[in-house]
A protein has these predicted regions:
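Conserved beta-strand in the GNAT
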Residues: 52, 58-68, 74-76, 81
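Conserved acetyl-CoA-binding loop-helix of GNAT-fold acetyltransferases
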Residues: 82, 88-101
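A short beta-turn/loop motif at secondary-structure boundaries
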Residues: 41-46, 69, 137-138
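Short beta-strand micro-motifs in enzyme catalytic cores
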Residues: 47-51, 73-75, 142-146
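Short amphipathic alpha-helix that is part of the acyltransferase structural core
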Residues: 1-50, 54-58
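Conserved GNAT acetyl-CoA-binding A-motif
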Residues: 96, 103-116
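A conserved beta-turn-beta hairpin within the catalytic core of GNAT-like acetyltransferases
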Residues: 68-77, 87, 106-110, 140-142
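Conserved catalytic-core motifs of GNAT/GCN5-like acyltransferases
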Residues: 113-115, 125, 130-145
Length: 150
């Protein structure tokens, strides 16, 4: 597989086409594929640093990165998503590692918290995240908070 190109962009730095591609991918996976009706555009995108991964000009991986205090008291990663065509290729692992690096580069080495789909806890565990708290339902999908300590 050709190498994914990674970029970190503030909300205002996203072009209209890039923002459309991000929202389309998030909707494709979180709303359609997972059959989950929820308000994806939650008002938090403007505060996020957006990690976009493209393959031959097509958005295939994406995550939102937040400074401590924006979503949780710790820095956080959310809306972690890969296009189906790159799943199983290691793109998801690369995405999580890039998101962690992004947070550290922007705001220094620190703990990172996320609200993960419970079924993906072992995946995130491979990147140093540990379950933190009890599982909870969010938009009809079981989630659990996970913390990656320093």
């Amino acid at each position: 597989m050709t190498r994914i190109e990674w970029r970190y962009l503030a909300f205002d730095a996203l072009s209209a086409a890039e923002l459309y591609a991000v929202l389309q991918l998030r909707s494709e996976v979180f709303v359609v594929e997972q059959a989950c009706i929820f308000q994806d555009m939650d008002g938090a995108d403007a505060q996020a640093l957006h990690l976009v991964g493209t393959l031959q000009g097509v958005l295939v991986a994406y995550a939102r990165c937040f400074a401590a205090g924006e979503k949780f008291s710790e820095a956080s990663i959310g809306r972690i998503v890969t296009r189906s065509c790159v799943r199983g290729s290691g793109a998801g692992h690369a995405l999580v590692e890039k998101a962690i690096s992004c947070l550290f580069q922007q705001w220094g080495t620190q703990a990172i918290r996320m609200g993960a789909q419970a079924q993906l806890a072992s995946f995130y565990g491979q990147h140093g995240f540990e379950k933190s708290g009890l599982p909870y339902m969010e938009d009809g999908i079981l989630h659990i908070e996970m913390l990656r300590s320093v």
